[in-house]
């Protein structure tokens, strides 16, 4: 049996990942999302606000109780949940939205990695896939919190991978930028004004020209590479630069 813990499964990439995982009878899916509505057949769902560290710890306690005593061949954590707001210049950003962005996009994945590594100790194959963004690797006006959080997630992944290697732990960690996906988050971005988000017209053109990838296609690519063990290697990677046949950067 394989264990998959996935966050942000209400919609978008997280939903697509969860549905694909749950289709395989060899997988046990544990979904963490802000809403348990629309349950995924074959999966267990836990409702939690990832911005609330105490609530997240309680949810992890429930997950740990669920999996305690079970034997898994493989355990995979997918930190997918994310928020882009506030979309605004830093001096115009809402303080609460700034704090929530960092909490959901950076603090929550780190807390989940911590608990995942502890609760899956002894599982032969352990993998952490942190869904990052190209925004963590270059500055984008209007996205100060999102860029900072994703850059932090990349570095947290590097450190986690280094610690696993130096301590002889068999854990693969990758912070993966999946490319631009056709999701609700993209819709919110396109609704911003040019004053809030200088690149808004470029994002609107991508939608109009059909260059956004469907979430289901991206999810299938990620899971195919993961199942083949081809996301191992560099702890910070871009799905668009990975050759689907070899898992090696082009």
Where on the chain are the PLM-derived regions?
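Rossmann-fold cofactor-recognition segment
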Residues: 41-54
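Active-site helix of classical SDR
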Residues: 113, 149
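Conserved glycine-rich Rossmann-like NAD(P)H-binding loop of the short-chain dehydrogenase/reductase
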Residues: 22-39
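Conserved mid-core segment of classical short-chain dehydrogenase/reductases
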Residues: 57, 73, 84-99, 118, ...
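N-terminal Rossmann NAD(P)H-binding glycine-rich loop of SDR-like oxidoreductase domains
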Residues: 10, 14, 18
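C-terminal helical subdomain
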Residues: 171, 175-176, 183, 191-249
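Residue(s) in the substrate-gating loop at a strand-loop-helix junction
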Residues: 133
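Catalytic Tyr-X3-Lys loop
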Residues: 91-110, 153
